[in-house]
Amino acid sequence: MEKLYDKSLTELHDLLVSKEITAVDLTEETLNRIQDTEEQLGSFITVSEEKAMALAKAIDLKGITESNPLAGIPIGIKDNIVTKDILTTAGSKMLHNFDPIYDATVMDKVYQADMIPVGKLNMDEFAMGGSTETSYFKKTKNAWDQTKVPGGSSGGSASAVAAGQVPVSLGSDTGGSIRQPAAFNGIVGLKPTYGRVSRFGLIAFASSLDQIGPLTRNVKDNALALNAISGYDEKDGTSAGVSVPDFTADLTGDIKGMKIALPKEYLGEGVQPDVREAVLKAAETFKALGATVEEVSLPHSKYGIAAYYIIASSEASSNLQRFDGIRYGYRSENVQNLEDVYVNSRSEGFGTEVKRRIMLGTFSLSAGYYDAHFKKAGQVRTLIKQDFENVFADYDLIIGPSTPTVAFGLGENINDPITMYMYDILTVPVNLAGLPGMSIPAGFSEGLPVGLQIIGKHFDEHTMYKAAYAFEQATDFHTKKPVILGGND
């Protein structure tokens, strides 16, 4: 049998429908692929072989039809998405043995689509980090170069897809945690509009910013995955009651007349020359396809990082109060009294970066500093939203780099939090405004992928996919493969 692990979702679907392969065949090959490459990559925290094989057998018995495009397709799940009977750790010692008794809403949708979860993917602890180096369990490697980070916090989700361990994965994005690792690994990653995908069962980091989204190796696959996981959920108070279009319906390659904005702030100081060049070339590609691309200004972007880290850390300090050593999660044995249970369980259960964010958030919310920090950050957030609204009054989309540079070395920035935080500078404004954003492959610098970020209007992922697909068809970046997937050096 030919190798299946680098095929698209559409190709796999055709093979399954024609009965050239079964869901059991595909799941077995996926599990073998994970086993063969996991030592090199470290993408998975848990592999759920028995459950995956049982599900594959049941799906084969039921039969796979043309009308169910994702039936029998294996999928990897970021380990902050709650999965019944599969350990869910959020990359933390605090939850190292947490076995949930319910599924997140996105998992319900995955099962409704007859997809097959094969395991839980490594991530920065509680999604706090940009390199997947803060995980309690292991350090994930970049699919293109195992001496480089895969990005974060959804590093496992990106590395696994780029290396062909799974054809699709779910990640979460609070300040760039889908788009940045997608860029670093040369794949497609989409953060949907806030409210498009249910957050019920997502272990919260910053509730006003978090959003679940798909990572795939091409645009159409990504649209298929978003079709499956989108929709209103009464269990999530921030879920939006908007209709879900078929995101694959308009992937024609025709974007004549589309108006695209390129903010000058996104190509400024700190952006690597090769990254800047790739974005400018992408702008020329869009022009050649019949779109107009014009320079605009998003003047408050430069305050995005400061506002984001105050808001996100403040929300995290509140959300993480629940991990106290009493109800569930890690409990210290080094205790004499109740106070020791709280203090020692949290001190021993949380890693350095999580503690740093809790401290920053608690400080920002404290009585003497609330107005100067948290309140002011909220006001800056409003200004950033207004900047986007002003541009979107005249344009359909905004483009720019996903990250200022390509992937950096393992260990290079782990002890320099400010440098690490600055890698989010181009992605956090999108979360602050609740907009959809995606990263698609757009070039290379010294053999490492460059990501192009596409930002859309609220609930207009449809137009983003349309433009991304047109760009993909006009270029060949998405066809390039890392060595681990059979590509050339």
UniProtKB/Swiss-Prot annotation:
Protein name: Glutamyl-tRNA(Gln) amidotransferase subunit A
Ligase recorded as keyword: yes
GO cellular component, one term: glutamyl-tRNA(Gln) amidotransferase complex
GO molecular function, a single term: glutaminyl-tRNA synthase (glutamine-hydrolyzing) activity
Protein's job: Allows the formation of correctly charged Gln-tRNA(Gln) through the transamidation of misacylated Glu-tRNA(Gln) in organisms which lack glutaminyl-tRNA synthetase. The reaction takes place in the presence of glutamine and ATP through an activated gamma-phospho-Glu-tRNA(Gln).
GO process terms (BP): translation
Active site: 78 (charge relay system), 153 (charge relay system), 177 (acyl-ester intermediate)
UniProt cross-references to InterPro entries, sorted A to Z: Amidase, Amidase_CS, Amidase_dom, AS_sf, GatA
Species of the source: Enterococcus faecalis (strain ATCC 700802 / V583)
UniProt subunit comment: Heterotrimer of A, B and C subunits.
The keyword Ligase appears for this protein: yes
Family of this protein: Belongs to the amidase family. GatA subfamily.
UniProt-listed Enzyme Commission number(s): 6.3.5.7
Alphabetical UniProt keywords: ATP-binding, Ligase, Nucleotide-binding, Protein biosynthesis
